[in-house]
């Protein structure tokens, strides 16, 4: 999955004071993704608007499938956590299928045909992603034995805390879990009445001790857990083998989920902040009505008509000229990436631009005798040079 790693885009976002807005927007994604949606923008916008017309729950956080698919291609064994990442995506698409939606969203969801072989894997995972040991008789009995042994350990420790010989050395009567070891917290000199291994020290100088009396029971638990792990691994091998055969299906849902994630993030972000979804048109005209830059608080809406070749902005110092320029460029940038913004979507019109370049920062340099005007002319010159160079390459 391609993610944004473009210093120029990051610089532009900072220049336009969109950093916080984009950061909040990214939080709505289920997994890390590019801001730009590859492909037919008109078609993407249709899906986004169709999704915007319905209420739905946000997808769960999902990991990237790159390593998962790589392991399956090499016929490797996936961990249960990796398998559950696939299960989460399938269950989320099933949630949409069960709603029996009409229109393009319903048609899209009907494309997800879940193989019976996948259901054989999915049924072993609970809603929280835990392996359901109740479905395996051996695992169920082993789990019951572990619970019994742990109960015996607790009983043994309780008897120790009630011991009159040990009582003078006990700092408290609780059972502490240190490094997965059940321990008692005792004072120095405990070795006269208690045999055990010291696991750690408390901040008050006490000793965390795991008594020898529970050592045999803990060893039995370790043996049982090793047996359980062997069974878990056999299941992981079996599941991975089945998923390997379903790799085309996994590739498909991975690609479609990335697309859906881009759509839902925009829709839910817009709904959460009462923002509008607007995409760039196929011309170069910019008409903003009721636009508010996301970095401004309690701001008055901006309206501007930039339908001619040149727009002249004048005003006194600290009169908002730079912020107006940032607003125009921000609107163009957000429309290009279909990022929700605050404006009157019915009266606004934002053209499409291959690139958005901002010459905003004050380039004045006293040492090199460069004024603000001269510095900005240099920036314009660099842009024109790049454009001319690309024109020469096309020839």
Show which residues each predicted segment covers.
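Residue-level signature of catalytic and energy-coupling elements of molecular machines
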Residues: 65-68, 210, 260, 288, ...
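A conserved P-loop NTPase coupling/switch region
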Residues: 56-134, 144, 161-241
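Helical mechanochemical/support elements of P-loop NTPase systems and associated helical scaffolds
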Residues: 39, 43-46, 61-64, 79-85, ...
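Conserved amphipathic alpha-helical "coupling/scaffold" segments
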Residues: 1-134, 138, 249, 253-267, ...
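Short hinge/gating elements
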Residues: 50, 135-139, 202-204, 236-245, ...
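ATPase nucleotide-binding head domains, primarily ABC-like/P-loop NTPase cores
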Residues: 273, 281-395
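Long, charged, glycine-rich C-terminal linkers/tails
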Residues: 163-178, 267-290, 346
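Charged, surface-exposed helical/loop "interaction arms" that form contiguous linear patches used
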Residues: 230-275
């Amino acid at each position: 999955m391609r993610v944004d790693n473009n210093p120029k885009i990051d610089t532009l976002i900072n220049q336009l004071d969109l950093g916080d807005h984009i950061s909040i927007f990214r939080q709505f994604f289920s997994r890390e993704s590019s801001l730009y949606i590859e492909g037919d923008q008109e078609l993407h916008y249709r899906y986004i608007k169709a999704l915007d017309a319905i209420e739905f729950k946000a997808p769960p956080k999902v990991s990237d499938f790159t390593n998962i698919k790589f392991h399956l291609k090499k016929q490797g064994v996936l961990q249960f956590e990796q398998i559950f990442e696939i299960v989460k995506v399938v269950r989320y698409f099933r949630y949409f299928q069960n709603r029996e939606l009409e229109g393009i969203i319903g048609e899209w969801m009907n494309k997800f045909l879940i193989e019976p072989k996948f259901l054989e894997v999915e049924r072993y995972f609970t809603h929280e992603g835990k392996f359901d040991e109740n479905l395996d008789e051996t695992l169920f009995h082993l789990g019951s034995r572990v619970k019994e042994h742990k109960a015996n350990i607790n009983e043994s420790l309780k008897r120790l805390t009630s011991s009159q010989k040990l009582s003078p050395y006990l700092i408290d009567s609780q059972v502490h879990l240190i490094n997965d070891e059940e321990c008692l917290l005792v004072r120095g000199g405990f070795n006269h009445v208690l045999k055990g291994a010291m696991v750690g020290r408390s901040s008050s100088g006490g000793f965390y001790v795991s008594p020898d009396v529970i050592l045999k029971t803990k060893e039995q638990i370790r043996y049982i857990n090793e047996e359980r792990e062997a069974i878990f691994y056999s299941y992981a091998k079996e599941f991975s083998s089945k998923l390997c055969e379903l790799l085309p299906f996994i590739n498909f849902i991975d690609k479609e989920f990335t697309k859906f994630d881009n759509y839902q993030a925009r829709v839910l972000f817009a709904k959460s902040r009462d923002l509008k979804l607007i995409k760039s048109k196929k011309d170069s005209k910019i008409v903003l009505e009721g636009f508010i830059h996301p970095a401004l608080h309690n701001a008055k809406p901006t309206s501007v008509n930039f339908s001619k070749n040149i727009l002249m902005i004048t005003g006194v110092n600290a009169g908002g000229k730079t912020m107006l320029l940032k607003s125009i460029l921000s609107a163009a940038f957000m429309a290009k990436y279909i990022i929700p913004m605050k404006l009157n979507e019915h009266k606004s019109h934002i053209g499409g631009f291959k690139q958005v370049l901002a010459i905003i920062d004050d380039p004045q340099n006293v040492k090199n005798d460069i004024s603000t005007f001269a510095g900005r002319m240099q920036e314009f010159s660099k842009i024109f040079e790049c454009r001319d160079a690309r024109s020469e390459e096309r020839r």
